[in-house]
Amino acid sequence: MTSRFTHRPAFRPASRSLAAALAASAMLAFTIPAARGAEALTVFAAGSTGGALATIAHDYTAATGQPVKLVTGPAGLLLERIEGGARADLFISANLAHPRRLTAEGKAGPTVVFARNRVCVSARPDVGLTSAKLLDKLLDPGVKIGTSTPKADPGGDYAWLLFEKAGTLRAGATAVLEAKARQLVGGRSAPEVPAGANPVKYFMQTHVVDVFVGYCSSHDTQPDPAFVQVELPPELAIQADYGMTVLEGRHDEAPWRFAMYLMSPAAQAVLPRYGFGAVGLADPGS
């Protein structure tokens, strides 16, 4: 199935009782407004959540007066910053492993699933990418593949998982794809792009790569007609669970209130607009 960045994946709904409980918890966040001049909450979050979280944080601040500072980037590098002593109140990663590591280290509370995503492949229309022929196209010697950086960014880890799965379908495919892939974003030494440019789109527009293995979600709510986004076929499909945890160190309830709000139907309803699966809605596609 091919679309022009309009595909929005379906996900299994959370239970209605859970949604009701989260709704009640979220109401508590609104009943106690932040004190005048309240210290901003610092949220370290995976770069792919930037658009959705900016909207959610804006709504929360407007309703409660609580300022929220978003710091987005490759989740693996954000994890390193936290472990190195960087101050953050919440951490949202594009995987569960990173926040669970902080939980196990005693640096954070329990880890919960905040949202779900899927891996998609984006391309210029002239590439002719389709879901049915996706693996053939990726293996084509003339097609240049871009990815994020494994270990530094879960997006790169998911790309390498895709390559591993490809190897179970075609002998030798894993080695071919790993050799072809260019790690262009998400690392410490990623190539520079013009100020304000979207790196993934820039590298495809300038033909540095022809396709890019990334997420089905987007930073924007409107599709970009300059590119197509293709869902992985069922035999290659990859789901990404996004983990969230509240970090130790702050001596008030503000981080926990915001965390509960993030899991509420009000906040979760924003996620599908950006292509994420919502775990806190009875109908995650609504």
Show which residues each predicted segment covers.
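Bacterial N-terminal signal peptides
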Residues: S17-T31
